[in-house]
Amino acid sequence: MEYSNLSALQLDALKEVSNIGAGNAATALSMMIGKKVDMTVPAVNVIKLEDIVEENGEIEVAGTVVRVLGDIAGNILLVFEKPIAENIIEKLVGSKQSPESEMGSSVLCEVANIISASYMNSISQLTNLAMAPSVPATSYDMLGAILTTTFIESNQYDEYILDIETVFLDDDTAENIGGHFYYIPMPGSLEKILKSIGIN
C-alpha cells in the first residue's frame, strides 16, 4: 500500500485504532510513575521522513525500540528527552541515573515494555490480530538519527512514511512532558489492520 494513497477515511480509522491503544499506554505509564499522564489524540500523517528529521533532529533523546511481532509486525518507538528520562528513572529506582547507564537503560526498557504491551493488547483485542513484543533496546542519540534508523528497520524506505505519533502530557498542566510514542507498521500490516475493522 502506497502511504500517499491512503484516504481520509483510512487515516481516520487508523487514528481511532491508535487512540484506543494510546489511552491504555498512558494509563500504564501513569501507574508506573505514580502521576496522572494524558496523551494527545494520535496524529496519523503521511509525510516525508526528512521533514520529521529536519523538525526534530537535533534534540538529544533516549529512544527505546520494541519490535512488534505477529500478524501486524512493525516497531514501537518510545522517546523521552533526557530530563524526563532521568526523572522517570529516579522515580522508579530511587536514585539519579543517566539514561546511558546500564541501570538507566534497563529501567527505560522496562517502561517501554509495559507501555507497548498495553498498546498492543488493546489493538489486538480490537482487531483480533496477534501482536507480541520483542525484547526492547534503548539508545541515546539525536532524535533524527533514532527516527531514521527505526523507520528504515520497519522497511519504510519510501519518500513518504506513515507517522503515527502520540505525545505524553502532564495531567495538571496539559503541557508536553517531553515524551513521544511512535507506532511504525511494516509494509502489509496496515492492510490487515484496516481490513480487520472493515475499512478497505
Could you describe each region identified by the protein language model?
Residues 2-18, 22-24, 30-200:
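Composition-driven recognition of glycine/serine/threonine/acidic- and proline-rich low-complexity segments
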